[in-house]
Amino acid sequence: LLKIPFYEKDWVVVGATKEELIGKGYKQIGKEFPVFLHPETKEEYALARKERKTGTGHKAFSFEFDKSVSLEEDLERRDITINAIAQDKKGNLIDPFKGQEDLKNKIIRRVSDAFKEDPLRVLRIARFAAKLNGHGFKVDEDTMEEIQKIVSSGELTTLSRERIWMETYKALTTDNPEVYFQVIEECGALSQICPVSQLDTSFLAKAMKTQTDPNVRWTCLVASNSSLEDINNSFNVPKEYVEISEVCSLIIAFKKLDSVNVKDIIELADKTDIYRKEERFLKAEKISNFCIDNNSNQNLNWNEIVKLINNIKASSDLKEGKLIAKKLREDRLNAIQLYLSES
């Protein structure tokens, strides 16, 4: 309805049983609740269901799948009204919660009181706000109040770090990922996920205009933060993201120095392991340019410096390890000194 490209269809089946679908050749794939693959199209078909909260957390629900469950009852358990619009095979829209009206008014609104039962919806609301920001959508006040209540209840702490990262990663792939972090900050969720209550999204906002790689975007968000290690750990980011953000953080600190000398360059090379991780360093260095003022007084060509450093090989005339390392370091220092004097 928003003309946003979609790549799959999910079907809700009313008035049927698991046995009936299996008898028609559908293959069950869902464990928590029955989801089936169509024998030909491989599209997903789920039995209409009702849910009941049984405890705390994202997975503390029991499900009811009998034939009496209506489509409206199934849609009532959805998170937001624009996600609670169904379409039958003839193209007719079923919209019991005025989702089309909210589409027209560009509002992200919860469907019902059942919304508050699932803490994951805090992050989902933030992600939808990021995804739909470019279309002018905003989270309505009542829904924002509800996610603040979920945060205050403490249930957000029951979410696994893996699930938190899954939603965060999806947000990083949207056109306005900074909105995701602004929403979780505003509702108080950020400080429950990690040991900071604020994240500076300005560098992320600057990078997202040209950079679509989620790793680049994440690094722009966190590399300048003094709690980098704790943030990476709290969001359960992949190892590659951790490494790039940590290297970028070191480069940013280096670029903020008023002046640098040869030893500073070698020290940075040592800390970032340029010798074995050349590509990682160069990627992080490019990202760092989004995270530092343009008036940095350093004008170093890191592609040339890295190439220069790594072209220097250990002397074959020396046999003792310590002597080899010392000579290699001296050669690198001399080469960089010569390069700087000629630049």
Residue spans of the language-model regions?
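Catalytic cores of the polymerase beta-like nucleotidyltransferase superfamily
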Residues: 1-343
